[in-house]
Design a protein with these regions (language model features):
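Acidic/His- and Gly-rich active-site-bordering loop/insert found
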Residues: 2-116, 120-131, 135-140
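Histidine/acidic-residue-rich, glycine-tolerant segments that coordinate divalent metal ions
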Residues: 83, 104-116, 120-121, 138-222
Length: 222
């Protein structure tokens, strides 16, 4: 048995591997992820019953938990028109959580986009999570949002998704970055900030140029 099947269904593995190959063939620059977004949305629509919301430059999918119904023993949740009994530990309200993946490609030295940073893999894995959640028979304790973020490479995509976090009162967001070469099933974590990036730095300096033969005519910038 493929060791990966210890963690996830073989059919889901095959589906997300094929999806990654398709995404790898259509890399797009930040804020231009038109084909990428459409492919991901079409995939989830074709393979799941998740609620999908198109937000223009990005989108999200939702796996809903059972809507709560107040009952005498406070253990009954309601789905459509069918009431079901669920375990006692799942009766408490929990705020929604989210999982996030980036969609954009890196701009190569030739100016063309390419998935050199693995965002095709990130988006495929998030779709795989969607497949898994959709296949679950057990009720969820909270709504789960899958956020497909654009423009991670230029630092603009997260800002676009902030409104959803506030509007839906999402309490926690999870994301990851693939790191090839590590053993299968390994998750690397670190206390505190990890892999933070600069948002950019501009320095303005004023001076007077001159020829090296006449340094006294120039003024060092300051």
């Amino acid at each position: 048995m493929d060791k990966r099947e210890q963690y996830i269904d073989k059919q889901i593995i095959e589906q997300i591997m094929e999806l990654r190959k398709q995404l790898h063939r259509i890399p797009e620059h930040s804020m231009q992820e038109v084909k990428t977004k459409q492919l991901l949305m079409d995939f989830l629509k074709s393979h799941t019953a998740l609620e999908i919301v198109d937000c223009g430059a990005w989108f999200y999918a939702v796996k809903r938990a059972y809507d709560r119904v107040t009952t005498e023993n406070d253990k009954t949740f309601h789905v459509s028109e069918v009431a079901v009994e669920i375990p006692e530990q799942m009766t408490e309200y929990k705020p929604p959580i989210a999982f996030r993946a980036d969609m954009d490609a890196v701009c190569g030295k030739d100016g063309k986009p390419g998935h050199f940073c693995g965002h095709d893999g990130h988006s495929s894995v998030l779709c795989g999570l969607g497949l898994y959640l959709d296949s679950r028979k057990e009720p969820l304790a909270q709504d789960v949002y899958l956020i497909f973020q654009p423009a991670e490479e230029i630092g603009k995509g997260a800002e676009l998704c902030r409104s959803l976090i506030k509007e839906k009162h999402i309490g926690e967001i999870y994301g990851f970055h693939n790191i090839p070469g590590k053993p299968l099933g390994t998750v690397l974590v670190k206390d505190g900030t990890f892999a933070c990036a600069s948002t950019g730095l501009e320095i303005h300096m004023t001076g007077t140029p001159s020829h090296a033969a006449y340094p006294e005519a120039g003024r060092n910038p300051g």
